[in-house]
Design a protein with these regions (language model features):
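Repetitive, compositionally biased segments used for assembly/scaffolding
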Residues: 25-110
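Generic extreme N-terminus detector
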Residues: 5, 21-22
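Bacterial N-terminal signal peptides that target proteins for export
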Residues: 1-9
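Bacterial N-terminal signal peptides
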Residues: 9-20
Length: 110
């Protein structure tokens, strides 16, 4: 294998990893993760969740406000035991998204 073919192979491998790294774990600007709108009724489960969530104090992907009714805006979550819009699992490492609880101005972080 020549040096130029090795470089071409290395470059191809590096470029193929860029799209996967840039989209992994990202919340879109309009508040979706993997097609799930990040507002609504949420159920916490111990396994097989739609989204793995880590609670952080700084640099969140999403700012979440707990509400008791009408979780209509992105970042407004109503925690329920039945009929959820999506499920989450709290994790300490390797989350799909990171959230921070807030009392006002929920939504996607800039």
């Amino acid at each position: 294998m020549t040096l130029s073919s090795k470089l071409l192979l290395l470059l191809t491998l590096l470029l193929s990893m860029i799209p996967a790294a840039s989209f992994a774990g990202s919340v879109t600007k309009d508040g979706y993760y993997n097609g799930i709108k990040l507002c609504g009724k949420v159920k916490v489960v111990k396994s097989f969740a739609d989204i793995k969530v880590q609670v952080v104090k700084s640099f969140p992907d999403l700012k979440v406000k707990k509400v008791n009714a009408f979780p209509d805006q992105i970042g407004e979550w109503q925690f329920v035991d039945s009929f959820p819009d999506f499920t989450i699992q709290f994790v300490d490492s390797f989350p799909d998204i990171k959230i921070q609880y807030v009392n006002s101005f929920p939504g996607v972080s800039n």
